[in-house]
Amino acid sequence: MVKKSPENTTPAIVDNVEALEAKLAQMREAQALFATYTQEQVDKIFYEAAMAANKARIPLAKMAIEETGRGVLEDKVIKNHYAAEYIYNAYKNTKTCGVLERDEAYGITKIAEPIGIVGAVIPTTNPTSTAIFKTLISLKTRNAIIISPHPAAAKCTIAAAKLVLDAAVKAGAPEGIIGWVDVPSIELTNMVMRDVDIILATGGPGMVKAAYSSGKPALGVGAGNTPVVIDDTADVLLAVNSIIHSKTFDNGMICASEQSVTVIDTIYDQVKAEFQKRGCYFVKQGAEMEALRAAMFKNGALDHRIPGMAAAKIAELAGIEVPAKTKILIAEVTSTDPAKEEFSHEKLSPVLAMYHAKDFQEAVDTAEHLVLAGGPGHTASLYVHPAQAEKISLFEHVMKACRIVINTPSSHGGIGDLYNFGMKPSLTLGCGSWGGNSVSENVGVKHLINVKTVAERRENMLWFRAPEKVYFKKGSTPVALDELGNVMGKKRAFIVTDQFLFKNGNTRAIEAKLDEMGIAHDCFYDVEPDPSLQCARRGAKQMALFEPDVIIAVGGGSAMDAGKIMWMMYEHPECKFEDMAMDFMDIRKRIFTFPEMGKKAYFVAVPTSSGTGSECTPFAIITDKETGIKWPLADYALLPNMAIVDADNCMTAPRGLTAASGIDVMTHAIESYVSIMASDYTKGLSERAAKLVFENLPSSFTNGAKDPHAREEMHNASCMAGMAFANAFLGLNHSMAHKLGAFHHLPHGLANAVILTRVMRYNAAEAPVKMGTFSQYPYPNALHNYAEMAKYCGIEGKDDKEVFENFITKLEELKDFIGVKKTIADYGVDEQYFLDTLDEMTEQAFNDQCTGANPRYPLMSEIKELYLDAYYGREPQDYAVC
């Protein structure tokens, strides 16, 4: 289908507000049509427009010289050529339409859309080349562009724009896609800025400020005041001739051109002589200098006639007699203060200030002052031997300039792609925040497109991490340990345990096996029930003196946690606990990266209780006795290398420990099953662990060692639940229990048990205020998951709700059987102290690491109600199943 361009119903001349309004309306239609073009169509238009501009480079240059009387014809030809050829070459293969990129794995699509109408303000210094540049990048990005030319260069600017428009339309672009103000005025320029979608502003500080004040996005450039430093290691011939080449290019009207040169004392005379040899004139101090000042500056500002004027002409204006072919007028000055020294300003003409510096540091300081005073963010130049890396580094760090060119003519180097081919070519040079600009690079096509990012839902890559070796079965400890000596060749073992287990002989069999294998060993047996940082430091110090290559932690969660912390201290004593304990939302994206473990020692965990599952988890909790702060550490770096799950090590556990640890296993199983991070790999372990607890905890509690099978099954259940929550994590139940233990000293397993079924009811709500945030958790599903686990455990019902209620009943029966009390108050927690600490306890529970994986994301007010209900034994109200 042939696309129809909007009819041209606007007046031929845009010289008033009504005409401009009509022009912009027509351009809106044209751009809407242009926005539907394919990349192939756009590239054809871009090619033909660039070709037409390049063919007309000489006529356009002549028009610019004739109209403005500024600059050098041949250089304007080069600028036009550059604006057409280099811009086309830079972007001919750049995708600017439709899909820019597509990442199937991450579900990300980036789509280019045009911005709309570009408002372009064109200076008198580079009228035709800037018009070519801005129209070409607008065409490449499917934008319309309206040009507001400088009044002193309106004809040549419009001629350049019309030439590009005609070529573009002939190649298929909509008519009116490029427009201009025929009779420019401040009123119409302000209207352009107000009514377009983005402004490309090139010109003086006042105009750029107006663009940024328009209320529309603006890509404006600040003033340039490029300082040059010539170091005493520089190639003087290269430096001087490069500066002359740059400064005389179009009589200095490129904004990146050199405005001053600072020379080191040892080569000052050499540089000066080289400038003179090459046709530059040093203005004499006194009358000549003052005459030149008076001619060039009016009321402290550059006279509008000066930009682009030849050196000899400026000298004539000042009444200074110089050779007709003088290339540059050089004024030797000392002050960098623009209020005191006019020659420190931007001059946009072949006039250069020259400063003397005793050393490189002073030269850099001078250049820094000049940049900040007159051209912050623009360009700075250094001539130095390439091997002087320290000097180059100092210069680039001190200069607040967005373009720092080394051994390069700054006019040519700043605009890009002439002396360095990685810098994009441009005639609009951003100066960043230092220059009050929105961009700090050379403006190009990427700045004229909006990029839509289409993000499709993806589920997180999950994982399953466990110790590389998990040995189990009653009596397996000596067989598993045999591997340390006979397979791994370990020589020195360090045992970590507590006093009770050590004195009770629980480590003797391990020590005997180590002796049998000829492995030297030492033992730290001072682990506290609530392991402290101070205890861990003592153990780590003893460990460092012994220098083990294997660590064996024997005991319950406390001994294994302490062992992990000592292992970390032994391997990496430089680590800070406050950093390691930082909470995370995603363990793979945490701010702190745990260091690699195992370079010094292999870690073996041997549990003697059936509850924490710490032998196969990446977690450890340590308390700083001096501050009272608990440091919960979580990272797979802390995962033991080997776990030995031998029921012989837990046969003598007393009833109270059996009950508390056993119900802790059940809580681990249930919470890991309904976690938003649960997976098929963890759910099987959670289900099996829960079933084993229902089947074996009553007998293990009642009969103890008389039922070794029940003891072994509980030991296995503890490890399986540990592996499940090591990968799926836990939830609010544990968050609240952690704080009950910390504030009111309830044993952890019992703290979990007393709130377990209340938290389950809370989570099972099908219309919660908030749900957990994780991509693979699409909607509230805890009720179904609870019912699914219950069914695996043999609990029945007509639907999920009934199964869930029966599950709750079965859990309450189990809790009653092992002696779990009904309320927090029943455990002797003082009511007033409970209420006094409730708010702090609530906030800390909310902030607990476990909370994030809970299926229902809790409000603090909800946590508080759960605590109160569990304290007083109130019937659940606002969190019942919906």
Positions of predicted regions on the chain:
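N-terminal Rossmann-like NAD(P)+-binding subdomain of aldehyde/semialdehyde dehydrogenases
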Residues: 2-110, 137, 277
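Glycine/threonine-rich beta-strand-loop-alpha-helix active-site module
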Residues: 160, 534-648
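ATP/NTP phosphate-donor binding region
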Residues: 461-550, 824-825
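Conserved C-terminal structural/oligomerization subdomain of aldehyde/semialdehyde dehydrogenase
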Residues: 35, 320-460
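ALDH superfamily catalytic-core signature
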Residues: 14-16, 132, 208-338
